[in-house]
């Protein structure tokens, strides 16, 4: 299985359940929700210790959905946040191949926040460089203090779709026909989508 995790940007949503996309791809996300509707109180000081967030990353692997031999793409343009690094490290420890999508030019200038002192590109098995500049945005506009249009989003989409095209080519060369989603906007779109999804579950790709 190919899992896609992205730290709050578009990589996972761009690739999952798209017309022309592979049914074998699985988006990965996790969060901790706490509902406790008491009266409003002053905000507590932020807790920067990583303990709790690391424990729920451990739970991601306890669910047995990510297994040795799977591939995990981890997208983070800065590559410095603790959860991203911890996810990559734990995935490798569980036998997954971890591919990082990041910016070497940007990330290498940032201080890592993980206790290991590592950035994403320093812990993964393979690095895909989206070549976003420091600060990510690339377009200068008169009258604005900061640039607009983050390069990482455009680069990530182009890189990932190119990889998917290459993957399809390689699979066909090996006699494997990958399950590809049609557009749901066709008259029979939903029926075909469910059919393709069931096919992918049965054969694994």
What is each PLM-predicted segment?
Residues 7-8, 105, 184-189:
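Glycine-rich beta-alpha junction loops
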């Amino acid at each position: 299985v190919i899992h896609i995790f992205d730290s709050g940007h578009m990589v996972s949503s761009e690739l999952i359940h798209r017309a022309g996309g592979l049914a074998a791809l699985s988006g990965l996300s996790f969060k901790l929700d706490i509902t406790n509707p008491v009266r409003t109180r002053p905000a507590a000081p932020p807790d920067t210790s990583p303990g709790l967030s690391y424990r729920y990353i451990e739970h991601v692997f306890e669910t047995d959905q990510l297994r040795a031999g799977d591939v995990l793409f981890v997208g983070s343009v800065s590559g410095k946040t603790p959860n991203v690094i911890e996810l990559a490290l734990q995935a490798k420890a569980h036998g997954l191949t971890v591919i990082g999508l990041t910016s070497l030019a940007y990330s290498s200038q940032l201080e890592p926040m993980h206790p290991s002192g590592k950035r994403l590109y320093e812990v993964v098995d393979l690095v895909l460089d989206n070549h976003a500049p420091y600060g990510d945005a690339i377009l200068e506009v008169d009258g604005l203090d900061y640039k607009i249009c983050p390069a990482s989003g455009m680069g990530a989409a182009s890189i990932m779709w190119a990889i998917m095209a290459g993957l399809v080519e390689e699979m066909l060369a090996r006699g494997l026909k990958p399950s590809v989603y049609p557009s749901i906007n066709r008259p029979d779109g939903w029926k075909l989508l469910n059919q393709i999804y069931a096919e992918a579950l049965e054969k694994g790709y």
